[in-house]
Amino acid sequence: MVLGWPLLLVLVLCPGVTGIKDCVFCELTDSARCPGTHMRCGDDEDCFTGHGVAQGVGPIINKGCVHSTSCGREEPISYMGLTYSLTTTCCSGHLCNKGTGLSTGATSLSLGLQLLLGLLLLLQYWL
């Protein structure tokens, strides 16, 4: 039982293992940068990034948590007096909507950590 407490601590503190999901949140913006803040999602929610376009102007973006049934939808949204067509793209990993390319790394790291913890638990009972 030597590894018991450290493994329990990692399970409690690692969001990918416990099922806790944070997403990046930022309001609608016309800036290419959307640094945002972290927000906690509900069990039935996914992280999303919304990309909006309107004829003759630059794109808009927003991020946050959304009910999984809203993923992939395109809907009109008003921003700064213009109507944009906003498409919601969802992902299900911890902070997966943070930026391009980071979601895959974060998800891979989480899965790798889960595999490592599982192997350590198995070794604990064999030794």
From Swiss-Prot:
A lipid is attached at residue 97 (GPI-anchor amidated asparagine). Its main location: membrane. Residues 23-97 form the UPAR/Ly6 domain. It is found in: Cell membrane; Cytoplasmic vesicle, Secretory vesicle, Acrosome; Cytoplasmic vesicle, Secretory vesicle, Acrosome inner membrane; Cytoplasmic vesicle, Secretory vesicle, Acrosome outer membrane. The keyword Lipoprotein applies. Keywords: Cell adhesion, Cell membrane, Cytoplasmic vesicle, Disulfide bond, Fertilization, Glycoprotein, GPI-anchor, Lipoprotein, Membrane, Signal. Pfam families: UPAR_LY6. Residues 1-19 form the signal peptide. Residues 98-127 form a propeptide. It is a lipid-anchor; GPI-anchor. Testis specific. Expressed in spermatozoa (at protein level). Disulfide bonds join 23-47, 26-34, 41-65, 71-90, 91-96. InterPro entries: LY6_UPA_recep-like, Snake_toxin-like_sf, SPACA4/Bouncer. GO terms for biological process: binding of sperm to zona pellucida; cell adhesion; fertilization. Disruption phenotype: Male mice are subfertile, and show defects in sperm-zona pellucida binding and penetration. GO terms for cellular component: inner acrosomal membrane; outer acrosomal membrane; plasma membrane; side of membrane. The keyword Cell membrane applies. Sperm surface membrane protein that is essential for effective sperm-zona pellucida binding and penetration during fertilization. Belongs to the SPACA4/bouncer family. This is Sperm acrosome membrane-associated protein 4.
